[in-house]
């Protein structure tokens, strides 16, 4: 099969480019040797029906034939010549095919394109899942569910294209100005059913956008497998018309007309070739007109079966296999062609010869089996095609119904949208008119606002005058309180300065007592130093004698031992060097061994890694070779399979792509519907939000009413508090008057002032609390006012919006119904109400602004008071913090200075040690760096190798994964192929079993016939033998004759039976042909019914259009109804809201009037307050006079204090002089003590050397004694000399012991003296610390006094300025109020406003405020000078005491060194104790 198909492919390729007229001759030459069978005629008939279906669905013979025939590509440029008179399909087909084309031609004028293109789109939708080959392979077809999925995908793609086009059109419309009356929708059914309007319909655009669909995969029924022939009457261009994309379905005007001529043209159109190795080709030569007729009928049948969606390949394949078998039997069983008997060819040689029974039975059985198989195959194929068409129609009906419902919903929604858009345009017009009206109203409002501003300016000028009066009153009260506080601060500072003077005198007395004690201690120390010097002179004389004796002894020993000691030192040095070198060598050897072990391990690791690399590379190469071999083997195995599967896969890919296109189109449509629904929901949400905003405005109005009521209550509370304060102030004024009259003397006045100050402090606290309450109330009032302003603005905006909306609604409803007129009247009334509301709001704003100005003036006064108080507090806090910081920093700096000196000495020692250590470390580092470089090189190699290993491992893993993937894919392919092969094998087995059963039945019958024949032959032979043996018997002759007669009868009966068999066969064949003709007639009827179905579909489509338009109109109606209902509801809500607002505005007007009345009352009360404050001012001025007298008394006391300070400073200067003289004495003593310490150190060193030399002398004496003993044994004459020497040595030892005892005594005395000096030093330190603390306290007091003086000066300056401002303000107020004096006197109480003079004389204030001269007699300046002198004197004392402590510390250290030397000589283990004892006083001094 494959070889034949390949040869035929080559033939068709060679013929594809040749002219059409040469095709029939070539086909006759190639096909002339083959015989045509009836089943091949059926295939031709099926193909012709497919052609007719192509005409009916596509409307263009060229395109339909290309779609129907071009898929297999096996018969290029072949054309059928069918006679219309002889064809049985001709008259019937004219109603379907020719009638359709006639209708097409008639309707081409105006509506041809629309109807044809609608039909083209519908046929496109139906033919998308039916374009694939039916006879490609033996595998079973896709189930019906997959067919539906394919159709859905194709639809989705089409809908996606429509969506894209709609988006483009929508953009173009948005850029261009849209006409008003044009009804246009993005979901237009005409646009959907007219694909020429789409940009995708053009071949250029589609080839650009759908170039990925250009594949060489065939579609449609494979005509070559049906055994079609082509005969040409007309010539057509032979360009390829493979359907690559949706653009190729574009309809064209039909150029030809006629019954079967169009079918011939369709079959004869150019065909494209495809490489399908499994396609079946059967070429048949045209024998007669009946053959052509039957061939055309078979073509139509097969094409109808395939167009109906029959995708079962097995049935058609089985029918073809049966036909092929029949053709082979016919050719084999008939060698010569001389005569034709009932369709069978009989040679001339076989006329007189009858075949045997076996041959006849075999031929009959084979022919019967072939006929049964053909009938079964054809019936099965037609049954499958009809069932598949029915199922496909049912499956298509469901999504079409869904689509229709979706389209209806879409049209209804479009109608609603159009209605809403019309309403929106009208609303925009109304909005523009309303905006113009608003502009006119705004101009009127501006004029009214200007008028109100002029009135407000007048009110502001009056209120500013009131504010200035209030501010002046507040400033006067503040100045009086400040003066009182300053007087109290001055009194306190004077008392503190008196206390400080007393403390300073006490400290002076203490210091004098301490100085006397110091003088006594110094005298005692001088006496002890004198005694020590005498003792040291005696000790020095004794030491000189001992040194002379020692030199005589050492001179003798040095000569003998010098050489020995030098040699010993050299030997020791060499030994030390040796040990050091050995230790270094051992250390280096250990390090080298460790490094070598590391190198060995690294080398081992390197070798191991190299081996792993080699093994991995071998494994890689082996796996690569294996994978390559396996791939080659699998490729060789699968090449044939892949070649077979490529076409199927490509076809499936195209089906999937079409499916995805349809799915995407559906999704986009659904998204459009959802977007439209969302827009409608947004409109509904906007309406709901407007309603909610109205409700919120109502709530805010209600809340503001409540807030206004609360404000009124708070205002009443504030008025009550103000009245109470006025009463308290009057009571205080009366009490002050009583106090002025009672007290005349200064002491009594002071007591009264203190009491009044206490009472005033309480009043100030009370007033401060009241101020806080007022501030809180004012802040709340401010916030409420801001909220009211915001609410008013929002109300204005809401009113403007509502007025605009009402006017829009009025105009819409005026156009549509009489109800709108009623609404217009209501909106006019609402406008008037809104204007009233606006006017009321303007009045409210004016009142609120006036109230706000009053509140701001009060706030400013309160804020200024707070700011001054906070500023003074913050300055005091900052000064205190700076003092504390300075003292802490001074202490920390002193501690750090001492610590740094200690650290410096330690660091110098450590640096010397580190330099020596660094040199040794640098040498070792150089050696280690050299070694490290080698190790680094090895490590880099290791890292590179490990990375290479990792990369190789990754490559191996990737290759293994790829191999596994390839193996799994190949396994899956093999499984698929195995399943296909098993299904094919099962079918072949079933056919083989049926064939074997038939052959076994026939073989049994043949065996029975042969057995009977052999039996008869045996009987005949016996009879012949008997006849030859006994020819004389007449009886036998008679029997033989009878048998011969019977034989002749049997032969005749056999001939008759054979004739009957032939008649039966011819009858069955005639019946088969009749049944086929009936089937063809039924198929023609089916085609006619399908034509009727198409007409019904057209009518249904028109019904759909009408239904969509109906839904559109219904949507418009529903939209209008919804908008009307919403307008009515909105209108009712607005009416209720306006009624509520009117009521609220009436209430607000009443409240505003009440607020105005209250404000007038408040202004009257404020005037009364101002008058009361003026009275209190006069009283305060009287109090200021009394304060001045107190200031004079304070100055007298300051003069007394100055005198005391001067006396104290003189006494301190004398004490300083005495201290300086004593410090000089102490310095001289310290110098002498230092010299003594140096000498003691030298003596101690000499004693230590002497002790070492004595030890050496003793050892040498022992050696000499040994030598003398030996010499005495040899020379007894030298014994007397030795005894003399011994006696001398004993005497020297006794002298040394006496010297040691004397040294011990001197050490004990030195210890006692040191302890005494340490105690005196500690007492001096404690006294110095006390003096320093006293100095710090005096410094603090000085700073406090300076700060207080500066504050007093500043306060006096501010008082003067305030008094001057008050005078000016009061004079101006008096000048302004001369004219309306009568009115003010009638309204205000009887107390007139007077401008009293400043109680403090100006000359005195100027003297106070002037900066002090160079030599002034003011008490503060003298105090400052005294404090500075005291500070300088205390600093000098502190320095002297520090120098004294340093000298004492140095003398003690020198004494300790002097005592340490003899102590070491006498007690070698007692050094630690002495050292510890000496270290204690040093630490104490250092501290």
From Swiss-Prot:
Composition skew (Basic and acidic residues), residue ranges: 785-796, 1372-1382, 1462-1474
InterPro entries given in the database record: MT-Golgi_org_protein
Record bears the keyword Membrane: yes
Modified residues (N-acetylmethionine): 1
GO cellular component: endoplasmic reticulum-Golgi intermediate compartment; Golgi cisterna membrane; Golgi membrane
Modification Phosphoserine, positions: 18, 60, 270, 381, 385, 461, 979, 1387, 1479
Region span, Golgi-targeting domain: 172-257
Membrane topology: Peripheral membrane protein
Coiled coil (UniProt feature): 358-1454
Any Gene Ontology biological process: cell differentiation
Cysteines joined through disulfide linkages: none
Composition skew (Low complexity), residue ranges: 269-288, 312-321, 365-375
UniProt main location, coarse: cytoplasm
Expressing tissues: Highly expressed in testis. Transcripts can be found in spermatids during spermatogenesis. No expression in Leydig cells, spermatogonia or spermatocytes. Detected at low levels in all tissues.
Region (Interaction with GOPC): 121-141
Tagged with keyword Acetylation: yes
Location of region: Disordered: 1-118, 221-321, 365-394, 785-804, 1372-1396, 1458-1487
Subcellular location: Cytoplasm; Golgi apparatus, Golgi stack membrane
UniProt PTM comment: Cleaved by caspases in apoptotic cells.
Biased composition (Polar residues): 62-74
UniProt keywords, alphabetically: Acetylation, Coiled coil, Cytoplasm, Developmental protein, Differentiation, Golgi apparatus, Membrane, Phosphoprotein, Spermatogenesis
Entry remark concerning the domains of this protein: Extended rod-like protein with coiled-coil domains.
Functional note: Plays an important role in spermatogenesis and/or testis development. Probably identical with the serologically detectable male antigen (SDM). Probably involved in maintaining Golgi structure.
Assembly and binders: Homodimer. Interacts with GOLGA7. Interacts with GOPC.
Name of the protein in question: Golgin subfamily A member 3
Organism of provenance: Mus musculus
